[in-house]
């Protein structure tokens, strides 16, 4: 809280959306500067992979699924005298997480072998914690539909070359081709409650619950799956 100044209310979704776009541009410039031979599509894919991993870790930290990871990693790197870049330390952490989660998110990707320039990774990590003195992100308190809405809108933009190296432009065709559309919360609630609750009503034990399988073949940001988990938990 700042004394003597009136705090302005800001939209969490709008602020996060803006910050994610900033992160995307920073990573693109930081990786493109030392990897000029990369094709634009592969570069965009690599940037998205890194950002996906960092967002996952921020959510996992705040929801206490993972211990604080990113800031401690920066502090360790700052104290280290090995000459290793923060980006390389981050890649090592990704390899550890791949052993734990065994998912496509942390599986090896060419981006891990690229050179990073100008402290891009450090800048992006700090942005994902918020702006000191103004706001902080708490992903534990942030509703899943807010994060999902922001993320699906964010995916509807593409990277384009500019004098600064990279800018984001809205790509209507990409949204249409890839089916990137946000499903309103009330629709998610209605469909999940009507499809899943009758099944849950017939469960009489934990063993019955373990037999349930929930499939969303076009999950996007996972709104339906997150709601399904909430309903099962309740």
Regions found by a protein language model. Give the residues of each.
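Preference for the N-terminal adenyl/adenosyl cofactor-binding alpha/beta module
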Residues: 1-233
């Amino acid at each position: 809280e700042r004394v003597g100044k009136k705090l302005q209310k800001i939209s969490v979704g709008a602020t996060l959306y803006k910050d994610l776009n900033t992160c995307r541009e920073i990573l693109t410039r930081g990786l493109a500067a030392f990897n000029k031979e990369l094709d634009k599509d592969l570069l965009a894919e690599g940037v998205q992979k890194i950002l996906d991993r960092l967002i996952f870790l921020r959510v996992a930290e705040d929801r206490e699924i993972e211990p604080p990871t990113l800031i401690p990693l920066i502090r360790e790197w700052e104290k280290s005298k090995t000459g290793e870049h923060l980006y390389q330390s981050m890649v090592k952490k990704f390899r550890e997480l791949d052993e734990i989660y065994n998912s496509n998110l942390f599986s090896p990707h060419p981006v891990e072998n690229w050179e990073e320039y100008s402290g891009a990774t450090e800048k992006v990590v700090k942005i994902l914690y918020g702006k000191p003195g103004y706001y902080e992100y708490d992903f534990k308190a942030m509703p899943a539909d807010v994060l999902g809405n922001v993320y699906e809108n964010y995916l509807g933009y593409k990277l384009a070359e500019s004098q600064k190296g990279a800018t984001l432009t809205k790509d209507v065709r990409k949204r249409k081709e890839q089916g990137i559309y946000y499903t309103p919360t009330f629709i998610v609630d209605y469909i999940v409650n009507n499809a899943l609750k009758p099944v849950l009503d017939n469960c009489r034990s934990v063993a019955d619950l373990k037999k349930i399988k929930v499939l969303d073949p076009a999950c996007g940001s996972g709104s339906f799956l997150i709601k399904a988990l909430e309903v099962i938990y309740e």
